[in-house]
Design a protein with these regions (language model features):
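Small-residue-enriched hydrophobic alpha-helices in membranes
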Residues: 1-129
């Protein structure tokens, strides 16, 4: 099921970092969640090194939504997993602000992921906290 190449994982991780930073609070918990995402797709790689690369990509990019093209090309199962990781990062600080909600709406629209399913993932994660 979990099949993404290294470059895709770096790009999607950069999007996760961007999502974590959008509320201007990039915590260690959020970094750990991004590392968990990396480990779930690249088991034999050094997740700290990949995270550092993703942070550099995020810092040097002015249009991170380009990485949604990488997501869009994948199966619905992988899209769902990525959306779940994005929501985990967002709710890790126990608040969802308007910028985070707007970002998720935009990402879901760009990758053709159903709003209803996105909302179900969000509710499932909120209820499991």
């Amino acid at each position: 099921m979990k099949k993404l190449d290294r470059e895709s994982v770096i790009g999607i991780s950069a999007l996760l970092v961007h999502t974590a930073k959008i509320d201007e609070n990039y915590s260690e918990d959020e970094k750990n969640l991004v590392r968990n995402f990396i480990k779930s797709y690249l088991e034999s790689e050094d997740e700290k090194k990949i995270l550092k690369e993703a942070e550099e990509v995020e810092n040097n990019s002015n249009q991170l939504l380009n990485y949604t093209n990488t997501i869009k090309k994948n199966s619905m199962v992988i899209k769902k997993d990525i959306i779940e990781h994005l929501w985990k990062v967002i709710i890790s600080d126990n608040t969802i602000d308007q910028y985070e909600s707007n970002l998720m709406r935009r990402i879901c629209g760009l990758i053709y992921f159903p709003d209803k399913e996105c909302a179900e993932i969000k509710l499932k994660l909120l209820n499991s906290k």
